[in-house]
Amino acid sequence: MTGLELLYLGIFVAFWACMVVVGICYTIFDLGFRFDVAWFLTETSPFMWSNLGIGLAISLSVVGAAWGIYITGSSIIGGGVKAPRIKTKNLVSIIFCEAVAIYGIIMAIVISNMAEPFSATEPKAIGHRNYHAGYSMFGAGLTVGLSNLFCGVCVGIVGSGAALADAQNPSLFVKILIVEIFGSAIGLFGVIVAILQTSRVKMGD
């Protein structure tokens, strides 16, 4: 087995071991009623969900941008050894990857500005509006984070191909750049959907 297969096997075994231990503990101490999704959703604070949305928006976007820059940058450096002329104009691909992280920062700021304090502590007093706001912020953060993650990988792979194609044939650069622009639009779609998800959100007393 390779190291990666051992890692996946270890994660799989650890996950199911934790599930078995939790199940046994809930059975022994008669806490099976707590193994309930509705109980979990109503007993957690809407602030937790909104902050999770903020964290996912920025962290997944940064991972996508870093991954794309890594893929593109390694190809630019490698191709630049044989064709030094590609180093400057292929930095456009790096800028496209960096824009993915900027999308995440913008959405994280938008979500954080919507989170308002409220005084209630009981689930009934918190109200449906605050729960809806927390879940919507979480969903928006997850939407923009995942879309930017895959957008960064997409732009990185296309940018890598653009750099290597440009090193071989300079006339191919503009054609592949158009493909890269369409790939970068994926992240923008995620931002638009996330803004729509949080457009009617109101949190507070």
UniProtKB/Swiss-Prot annotation:
Coarse class of the primary localization is: membrane
Residues flagged as site, Essential for proton translocation? E98
Give this protein's Gene Ontology molecular function annotations: P-type proton-exporting transporter activity; proton-transporting ATPase activity, rotational mechanism
Q: Which organism is it from?
A: Mus musculus (Mouse)
InterPro entries attached to this UniProt entry: ATPase_proteolipid_c-like_dom, ATPase_proteolipid_csu, F/V-ATP_Csub_sf
The organism's place on the tree of life at top rank: Eukaryota
Membrane-spanning residues = 4-24, 52-72, 91-111, 138-158, 176-196
Q: How does it sit in the membrane?
A: Multi-pass membrane protein
Cytoplasmic-side segments: 25-51, 112-137, 197-205
The name of this protein is: V-type proton ATPase 21 kDa proteolipid subunit c''
What is its quaternary makeup?
A: V-ATPase is a heteromultimeric enzyme made up of two complexes: the ATP-hydrolytic V1 complex and the proton translocation V0 complex. The V1 complex consists of three catalytic AB heterodimers that form a heterohexamer, three peripheral stalks each consisting of EG heterodimers, one central rotor including subunits D and F, and the regulatory subunits C and H. The proton translocation complex V0 consists of the proton transport subunit a, a ring of proteolipid subunits c9c'', rotary subunit d, subunits e and f, and the accessory subunits ATP6AP1/Ac45 and ATP6AP2/PRR. Interacts with IFITM3.
Gene Ontology BP annotations: proton transmembrane transport
Q: In which tissues is it expressed?
A: Ubiquitous.
